[in-house]
Amino acid sequence: MFNGMGGNPLKKRVSLLANVGTLIAPIPNKAAYLNGSVPVPKALFSHRDQIEQWQTSVPQGMQILTGWGGRAADIIHNAANTEQTGTYYMPMNFSVAGNSAFQIGASQGQFVITGAGALAFSGSTGDSAILKAKDKIISDTVASPVEEHYRNLFHRTHARITANSMARGEDFQQHFSNPDLMLGTENIADVIRDAPFPNHWISAQFRAAVKTIAIREQLKLRRQTVFIDFGGWDHHAELLQNHGNMLAVLDSALYAFQQCLETLGLANDVITFTASDFGRTLRSNGQGTDHAWSGHQIVMGGPVAGGQIRGTYPSLVIDGADDIGRGGRIFPKLSADEYFCELLRWFGVAPGDMATVLPNIGNFYDPGSSTNPVGFLKP
């Protein structure tokens, strides 16, 4: 897809971003890092901290409860998803991989699903005690004013939230699991079934992502994010075999995912992008590599100016100009904030709101600029 989709050189759907990482401010050179003249992210080389920082875009390590995708949803959900009227509400952030800090906002949450669709309350179908309890919860939300006067406020609030969650789950599931749902002239389920997804557990997440995007009209959503998690890349040993196998799976899954979007007429409406906590050392530890800093990322989709490598490719010389030590730890020249900012501009976040979503963006780029910060998207 870097050189063309399905053999078509006019459909270059993939570009690569070189030398990207978490930064608070630009690091002009190796000496600036070593002498401490520039601030650097907290707890570099720590999986937990760097995963959090990629998802929150707050590398200072402050206690932050929201992610940059969630903060974007806080700003644009109501303005973008105008078909959600009255009491109807469906979150715009979906996760097929459990809870993610990335999608949590101050007012907007995430809708967690599985490969089979919405999470269901165990026993919430059929003639069960849990189903009866569910019916009581729903009835509690419409109790008479006299009855409500004597109810505990926490109980009523919990009942209302639970009832709304159940209703949203049922609404989502009826569309997600509909085998006859069409998008244009294409049957959504058939397109997903026929796509060449690899025989691997990650394919269930990609299939669910396709379907969630394809039913956006039924969910009254014009903007969505879908979070997928493909872990297991910490190859301190058996690097060559494990890394190669996982890259092959990812390659096949991305291709099948993009093929579905092309067939369903959604290719120009979706950008797929990767985010990983850090790269690896240049020097082997014997059978693998250790934690480093900067890495490379993938962007894919119709809006992507494909067939490019954006960013500054680093020197791969041990102890060279870009190696800060410990066996080839490369420092990033392109900030995660610049990467995210270009995506958010396309997504609809206004220049005046960008610093709310990405607090450090002003250290790298003027959000009011007429040009994108990196240039991996089509003008």
Q: Could you say what each language-model-derived stretch is?
A:
Residues 1-251, 259-260, 308-379:
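Feature for exported/extracytoplasmic and membrane-associated proteins, marking the mature portion
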Residues 13-15, 271, 296:
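Proline-centered loop/turn at the N-terminus of a beta-strand
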Residues 220, 265-268, 289-293, 302, ...:
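A structural signal for short secondary-structure junctions
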Residues 223-225, 267-269, 275, 292-295, ...:
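Active-site lining segments that contact anionic ligands and/or coordinate catalytic metals
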Residues 228-231, 273-275, 300:
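Generic beta-strand/beta-sheet core signal
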Residues 254, 260-286:
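Metal-dependent active-site segment of extracytoplasmic phospho-/sulfohydrolases and closely related
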Residues 276-308:
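Histidine-centered active-site microenvironments of extracellular/periplasmic hydrolases
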